[in-house]
Amino acid sequence: MAKSSKVSIVGAGGNVGSIVAYSVAMQGLAHEVILVDRDKDRAQGKALDMNQAAAAMRTHSIVRAANDYTDIEGSKVVVITAGFPRKPGMSRDDLLFANADIVSEVVENVVKHAPDSIIIVVTNPLDTMTYVALKKSGFPKNRVIGMAGILDGARMTHFIYEKLGFGAGQIRATVIGGHGDYMVPLPRYSTVAGIPITDLLTPQELQEVVEATKNGGAQIVKLMGTSAYFAPGKATAIMVEAILQDSKKIYPCSTLLEGEYGVHGIPNGVPVTLGANGVEEIIELQLTPREREEFQRSVDSVKELIDVLENQNYFGEK
């Protein structure tokens, strides 16, 4: 266990935040799990429910609802899930200014009360909110990370299984790029028990998997009337686990690129090693010209949103 095994989830009253907290507590990843939410009664109710579940599981995790932001002091990881959810027909981009304000407010309190923490951003539009958290916190880039590719890779893994009908638990899928319409699924870097997926599926089947992956979140919104939460919550908990256990495992995450992949000053999803210091290394994949072009489109889509904020002097810079 990490020396500081305290994790705080801001927006824990929501579905994704609740799943993150529940996963962390049930696995006993942290001794303290702090639920921060504007609806304090809801947070207290969820904390009580989770503590009883932890007792049944006989884990040592203690879940507490925060009275205010002072309760996040000493956190090793702060997860930001707070924000307005997507509704049917709403793009992630529609959420831009509303959620930027929420993330800015949260980050201001993180800087004040947990200045040594690692921030994991889950709020959409993901890559842009990661940039907002970076700018507003002033933290080094390794300590502000966006949750993206683990979720998208999990969706791709599921759709590969649907095509194959075998290999459940043995499929490893790789998705880079922004967490949105311009994500870049990479069949070349996806395998089943070490066998390249390109050897098992036809080009047409692969294209169908790619399209299903890109539309995976929207499909759930259409069916449920709200965003997914089980898979995003679990994907975030996997990141928390890697940081607390200093595992150095490789996961695709949104991180600020400063020359890697030919990109400067824009966060985007790429494979990284996650450990006690957050992002400890960025892994540069050898992309084909077509993959690089798709990745650049993803970067450009994030830059467009960042430019919208900067053109409104959102970060107070001249």
Curated annotation (Swiss-Prot):
InterPro entries: L-lactate/malate_DH, Lactate/malate_DH_C, Lactate/malate_DH_N, Lactate_DH/Glyco_Ohase_4_C, Malate_DH_type3, NAD(P)-bd_dom_sf. The active site is at H179 (proton acceptor). Keywords: NAD, Oxidoreductase, Tricarboxylic acid cycle. It comes from the Bacteria. GO terms for molecular function: L-lactate dehydrogenase activity; L-malate dehydrogenase (NAD+) activity. GO terms for biological process: lactate metabolic process; tricarboxylic acid cycle. Its EC number is 1.1.1.37. NAD(+) binds at G11, A12, G13, G14, N15, V16, G17, D37, N99, V122, T123, N124. Gene3D superfamilies: Lactate dehydrogenase/glycoside hydrolase, family 4, C-terminal, NAD(P)-binding Rossmann-like Domain. It catalyses: (S)-malate + NAD(+) = oxaloacetate + NADH + H(+). Substrate binds at R86, R92, N124, R155. SUPFAM superfamilies: LDH C-terminal domain-like (SSF56327), NAD(P)-binding Rossmann-fold domains (SSF51735). Catalyzes the reversible oxidation of malate to oxaloacetate. Belongs to the LDH/MDH superfamily. MDH type 3 family. This is Malate dehydrogenase. The lineage of its organism: Bacteria, Pseudomonadati, Campylobacterota, Epsilonproteobacteria, Nautiliales. The gene is mdh.
